[in-house]
Regions:
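Glycine/serine-rich phosphate-binding loop and adjoining beta1-alpha1 elements at the start
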Residues: 1-51, 56-62, 88-234
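N-terminal Rossmann-fold NAD(P) dinucleotide-binding loop
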Residues: 52, 244-248, 270
Length: 527
């Protein structure tokens, strides 16, 4: 089966509705419409420009839930900041150019005459539209504002892409939920017990969320301004998919960034990545461009930032050279094993993020102060190895599968020949020659009918927002070290934002962080 830009969105719909199959043609044919509007004052601020572009970037990728997006903004509006991928001086022209380069199935067009027929409206700044399902957003520095009944604030000149992007994600998620609910009720009115519609909650009234201290409706006092130049010093991002890519995109939106950044990811951009990779355009997926190269280009305007792009898995990279001191490591990788390997390499700080369907977390690891990645991702001895289960179904040996997964290798004709008989027996789609085993498994785990794989197709907003928050943690680590995450935050995005962070303690019997030898080695390494 050919991979499409909406492949993962369709799989996500199945999981949200707890359905083995959906009528993909009907989902594409049934309209799902969103109007994005902005007033003159909001669009003149840098924060308003950040929020508008992130909203366009995210929502236009969500076909077939969204089929049409209208954009109504003042025509003379011009950029006062650099927003990655949105090039040119005039904002409307830059948006239309971005959509042309994205080339996805959701139709995005300028709207001059506003009618009441939209399923939902996202207003960048205050709105006086009398249209049902209108969500308004604004930001002030680190603080995002989202309202269902009219904003009590506006975009301020306290420029900060983190707060603006958080507002766009939370507000964008609200309009997405409204359109998703409308279409799913129309196309699949009967709900299973595990249908996500039982748990959907919408913002009522007004809500603020601080990307600085993770408070909901808290005091706006804790909201420091960003310096013009931020020294990232030595930063490593392992995994530049949706989360790590959103971190890099957010950092690329700063006024100036200097230091050294290492990007690690073995994969190329694929069509199915397009629903959640905010840095990717069609040219990247068509050319199978390495993810690290696409992300590196985002950061090319920073003259004092040295970016190293490593198209390797973390295991391959660390096996090929000695790992010295890693100052700050951002972990947005897919497997527990890789996270444990990262922890054994003993970075000074790890910023870890992950998502399961609609629920994400961000975590900071400080040895001796918080749970380490071995505490939180310890292997369960009772679990049957996934490779054994896959071997029984695919016809490949467990050792072959382990190697294919660990090296991110491509399948050859000989693999496919041996999988053919199993495909006929179990009814799964055979991979293509040259396709990565991990990519094929991700796309067809449902056909394998393996409850043990528990593969999930996450909600795009739930992959991007943690990446934005991790970028905020990088900024705080360098500029506001007394205010870093202590040490865990989670948010289920089909619900309302959770209020505040949770401080967790290390596991008392952890073989790594509770070891005196580990603490002595860490102290010797970092003084």
């Amino acid at each position: 089966m050919q991979e499409r830009a909406d492949s993962r969105t369709l799989e996500m719909i199945k999981q949200l509705l707890s359905k083995a199959r959906i009528n993909t043609k009907r989902w594409a044919e049934e309209l799902g419409t969103v109007l994005i509007v902005a007033d003159q004052k909001s669009i003149e601020t840098a924060n308003g420009q950040f929020a508008l572009c992130m909203a366009i970037n995210m929502l236009s990728r969500l076909h077939p839930v969204l089929t049409h997006i209208g954009v109504s903004i003042p025509d003379p509006a011009v950029f006062s900041v650099n927003v990655p991928l949105f090039t040119g001086n005039k904002i409307l022209d830059a948006i239309l150019d971005f959509i042309n380069k994205l080339k996805l199935d959701c139709k995005v067009e300028r709207v001059d005459l506003i009618h009441r027929g939209w399923d939902a409206v996202l207003s960048i700044g205050p709105s006086n539209l009398a249209i049902e399902n209108t969500i308004s957003i604004a930001s002030d520095g680190w603080i995002a504002y989202v309202a269902a009944d009219g904003l009590a604030t506006v975009f301020t000149k306290n420029t900060n892409p983190i707060g603006a992007y958080a507002a766009a994600c939370i507000g964008g998620m609200e309009v997405f939920k409204k359109v998703f609910l409308k279409k799913s009720n129309l196309l699949l009115p009967e709900k299973t017990p595990f249908d996500i519609r039982w748990r959907l909650k919408f913002i009522k009234g007004r809500l603020s969320f601080s990307a600085f201290d993770y408070r909901v409706n808290g005091s706006p006092a804790n909201n420091p301004s960003l310096p013009l130049t931020i020294n990232g010093r030595d930063l490593t991002i392992a995994g530049v998919g949706a989360g790590g890519g959103a971190t890099a995109y957010s950092l690329a939106s700063l006024h100036d960034l200097e230091g050294r950044m290492t990007l690690i990811d073995p994969d190329e951009v694929k069509p199915s990545n397009m629903n959640r990779y905010v840095y990717a355009l069609q040219r990247d997926s068509v050319s199978n461009r390495p993810k690290v190269e696409a992300v590196k280009e985002l950061l090319s305007d920073f003259k004092k930032l040295d970016v190293q792009a490593c198209q390797n898995s973390y295991q391959e990279l660390t096996a090929s050279r000695e790992i010295g001191n890693i100052d700050v490591l951002i972990s947005t990788v897919d497997t527990k094993e890789t996270r444990r390997n990262m922890q054994w390499d003993m970075p000074r700080v790890i910023l870890d993020a992950a998502v399961v369907l609609t629920d994400f977390y961000v975590r900071r690891v400080d040895i001796g102060k918080s749970p380490c990645l071995i505490c939180t991702h310890s292997p369960k001895e009772v679990e049957r190895p996934l490779e054994e289960i896959l071997s029984e179904v695919t016809g490949l040996s467990a050792s072959e599968i382990a190697k294919l997964r660990s090296t991110n290798a491509c399948l050859v004709q000989e693999h496919i020949n041996r999988m053919t008989k199993s495909s006929e027996k179990y009814g799964f789609t055979l991979p293509s020659v040259g396709e990565r085993f991990s990519d094929w498994l991700m796309m067809h785990c449902g056909e394998l009918v393996l409850s043990a794989t528990q593969e999930r197709f996450p909600l795009p907003f739930a992959t991007v927002l943690p990446g934005i928050l991790i970028a905020g943690e990088v900024i705080k680590e360098r500029c506001f070290p007394k205010d870093v995450l202590q040490n865990y935050y989670s948010y289920d995005m089909i619900n309302l934002p959770a209020n505040g962070m949770t401080e967790m303690k290390p596991v008392s019997d952890c073989i790594f962080c509770s070891s005196l030898a580990t603490k002595e080695r860490f102290a010797k390494k970092y003084g």
